[in-house]
C-alpha cells in the first residue's frame, strides 16, 4: 500500500541516464558530491545516475539517518546485471557495518532482547508487516563481525549479557560465511 511504501521509504529511480544528476545539480550539488555519495558514476560521456529503472530503499543507521540506498532491478534491459545493488562504499556507507531496517527495529530489539536476521530488504518489509518488528538484514553481504557488534550493543545491556551473547554469535558466524 502507499502507507507501507512511505513507512519503508520505498522509491523509484526512473530510467534515463541523468535524471538525478540534473535534479541535484539544480539544487546546487556538485558532480563530485554526487560521486562521493555513491549516487552517480563517472562514464566516458560524463556523470550519470547510478540507480536507474529500479525500486529503491533508503539504508539508514540506527538513528534513522540515511547512509545509502539499496535498489532492485525492474527492467530486463538494465545495463547492470545484478538484481540488487547498493550504494558503493562511501565515507558514510560501509555495507559490512550497516544492517537494513535497524532504524525501524532498534526499539523492539532492545525491548525484547531478540533479533531476526533475514536475507534482504523485501524480507525485512514482509516481516515487519507481519508483526515481526525485530527483523533486520545485511545489505548484500554475509553477516559478519561488524554486524554482530551492532546486534550485541542492542541486545546485551550489561557486561554479563554481552559475554553470554558472544558464544551464540560465534556459532552464527560459522554458518553465515
Name each model-derived stretch.
Residues 16-166:
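Phosphate-handling DNA/RNA-contact segment within nucleic-acid enzymes
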Amino acid at each position: 500500500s502507499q502507507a507501507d511504501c512511505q513507512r519503508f521509504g520505498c522509491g523509484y529511480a526512473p530510467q534515463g541516464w541523468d535524471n538525478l544528476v540534473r535534479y541535484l545539480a539544480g539544487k546546487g550539488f556538485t558532480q563530485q558530491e554526487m560521486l562521493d555519495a555513491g549516487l552517480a558514476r563517472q562514464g566516458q560521456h560524463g556523470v550519470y545516475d547510478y540507480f536507474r529503472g529500479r525500486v529503491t530503499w533508503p539504508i539508514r543507521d540506527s538513528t534513522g539517518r540515511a547512509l545509502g540506498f539499496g535498489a532492485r532491478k525492474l527492467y530486463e534491459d538494465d545495463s547492470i546485471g545484478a538484481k540488487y545493488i547498493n550504494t558503493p562504499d562511501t565515507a558514510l556507507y560501509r555495507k559490512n557495518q550497516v544492517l537494513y531496517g535497524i532504524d525501524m527495529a532498534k526499539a523492539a530489539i532492545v525491548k525484547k532482547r531478540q533479533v531476526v536476521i533475514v536475507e534482504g530488504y523485501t524480507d525485512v518489509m514482509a516481516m515487519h508487516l507481519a508483526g515481526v518488528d525485530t527483523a533486520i538484514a545485511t545489505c548484500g553481504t554475509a553477516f559478519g563481525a561488524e554486524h554482530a557488534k551492532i546486534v550485541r550493543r542492542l541486545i546485551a545491556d550489561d557486561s554479563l549479557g554481552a559475554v553470554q551473547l558472544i558464544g551464540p554469535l560465534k556459532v552464527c558466524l560459522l554458518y553465515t560465511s
